[in-house]
Amino acid sequence: MPICIQNDLPVKNTLLEEGVIVIEENRAKNQDIRPLNILILNLMPKKEETERQLLRLLGNSPIQIKVEFLHVATHQAKNTANSYLKKFYTTFDQIKDKFYDALIITGAPIEHLEFEEVNYWKELQSIFEWSKTHVFSTLNICWAAQASLYHHFGIKKEQVDAKIFGVFEHDVLIENHSLTRGFTDSFLAPHSRHTKIEEEKLSAIPELDVLARSEDVGTLLLATKDLRKIFITGHIEYEADTLQNEYLRDKNSNLPIEVPYNYYPNDDDTKTPQNTWRGVAYLFYHNWINQVYQLTPYDLKELAK
């Protein structure tokens, strides 16, 4: 089934070229189908890149999905024109009375700041609280995962000495869990972060299940037992060249950066990197969407009861 997006969203043509099935809003309105309504809070600087990465994965589902994009109103975007945000994005004030089957909150390159120093922290806290009664399942990615764990459970992030940067091997910890169904026992996934969460703090919270972790970089995937909150500390949505673009950006700016671990063939940054995590990314999003479809109330207003 297709994803339903705004008719003239710029990434639409790229998705169509890749074979992603897209349906325009005008056509979807004439279909007697209850789609899954998913809101994406995009905190990344390069909005279109993140849109493309997430829509590609959501579009692999057999379930029709209607997607809306949200941006924080208390932050002035530096890399995206206001006209683009006004046309394709909404604000929290505009949607806070609506209900959604799922919410995705992306990462953000602001790990050097304490959460309270982030200029949109209070707005994000409001969104976290709102999601308890207006969203069935929230998927938090990288920085958003750390922010959500801090807000909901009081777990603080910790700075690491060297950036966790590359493609690492992970092990599935809970067999036959609905989110990791079909995963191989071990799999690869990329990370790009300067902070971590102490695993002892996660294991001390009975409400949380750690589903996948790495001996090298710690926990990758965890979720509350009711699947209302899901956390990914890495970036399985990344494209093959995303880590390369980050690496070259920092290298060309003379910033301290190592070659991404286990990314380039033979660790040679003149060679073309391969996407070795694509399968697990598609499978995870397929599993998550399937669980949302199975468990979300048909009448989303029941979430507020």
Spans of model-derived segments:
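Amide-donor transfer/coupling interface in amidating biosynthetic enzymes
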Residues: M1-T74, Y89-T90, I95, F99, ...
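Short, glycine/acidic-enriched capping/hinge loops at junctions between secondary-structure elements
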Residues: T50-Q53, N79-N82, F115-E116
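N-terminal beta-loop-helix "entrance" segment that forms/cooperates
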Residues: A73-K86
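Cysteine-nucleophile active-site neighborhood
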Residues: I105-I174
